[in-house]
A protein has these predicted regions:
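Conserved, mostly hydrophobic/aromatic
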Residues: 20, 75, 103, 132, ...
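Short, hinge-like loop/turn segments at secondary-structure boundaries
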Residues: 37-38, 68-71, 91-93, 129-131, ...
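Anion (oxyanion) recognition and catalysis
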Residues: 43-44, 104, 225
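Core AdoMet radical
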Residues: 1-6, 10-100, 109-113, 138-143
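Catalytic cores of alpha/beta
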Residues: 57-67, 118-133, 187-199
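Conserved strand-turn element in the central/C-terminal portion of the radical SAM core barrel
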Residues: 18, 24-28, 99-123, 142-157, ...
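Alpha-helix N-cap and loop-to-helix initiation/capping positions
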Residues: 30, 34, 88-95, 120-127, ...
Length: 231
């Protein structure tokens, strides 16, 4: 019920996509059933497009999500194939690619991007953008690392705004027809990342994220309207 009411609140603010995001390797058992019930309820009572992010699911689970009304699945590849083992040890880069292929086989569109500022090179960022292009991804979130105390990357130096903007421009150049989405970390940029929309970003994930707070919907709407964008 809480999820349904939250979805309705966001729909009233003209948000056109609503996503449930869970942590962990994969949502299974009773938790998956709970998520499916929530998706069915939202599909019945709301007009927003439904998105999901539940880890490394099986083909059967992707089929069930599709039947429950989910239209898009979120599965970040995080970084380049070369850099992935430096960031994640619980699963492989190929596991990520296989999950994307399963979601696509179930008839879901896929939202996939990554995190910048984790110590990767420019070559890693370019390779990540090329991989997403080869997968046919049309929704690419770019998250900016905000080091959190107690995590392995807590001492990672923050990216300059210029480097962030150049990275966004590269992703736009390699993926000219995709929605390049500003995601977590952009509220650390000047004016909530306003310049990023002039550098190639043409979408944003608004509201709170899994581990960090995000921008208020009203603030994003005002900023984008002032820049002349159609919402």
């Amino acid at each position: 019920e809480e999820i349904l009411e939250d979805c309705k609140r966001h729909e009233a603010k003209k948000v056109h996509r609503y996503s449930i995001v869970t942590a962990g390797r994969a949502l299974t058992g009773a938790e998956m059933e709970k998520a499916l019930r929530a998706y069915r309820a939202m599909k019945k009572e709301c007009k927003v497009e439904l998105c999901a992010s539940h880890g490394l699911l099986s083909q059967e689970d992707f089929n069930r999500l599709k039947e429950a009304g989910v239209g898009r699945y979120h599965a970040n590849i995080e970084t380049s194939r070369r850099n992935f083992p430096n960031i994640c040890t619980t699963h492989t880069f190929e596991d990520k690619l296989e999950v994307i292929r399963r979601a696509q086989a179930a008839g879901l569109s896929v939202c996939s991007g990554g995190i910048i500022g984790m110590g990767e090179t420019w070559e890693d960022r370019i390779d990540m953008a090329i991989t997403l292009s080869e997968l046919g991804i049309k929704s690419i979130p770019i998250n900016i690392l905000r080091p959190i105390p107690g995590t392995p990357l807590e001492h990672q130096a923050a990216l300059s705004e210029d480097e962030i903007l150049r990275t966004i421009a590269i992703f736009r150049y390699i993926n000219p027809t995709a929605m390049v989405r500003l995601a977590a970390g952009r509220n650390s940029m000047e004016h909530s990342g306003e310049q990023a929309f002039r550098s190639g970003a043409n979408a944003a994930i608004t509201g709170d994220m899994l581990t960090t707070s995000g921008n208020r919907i009203s603030e994003d709407q005002e900023m984008l309207a002032a820049m002349g964008f159609t919402l």
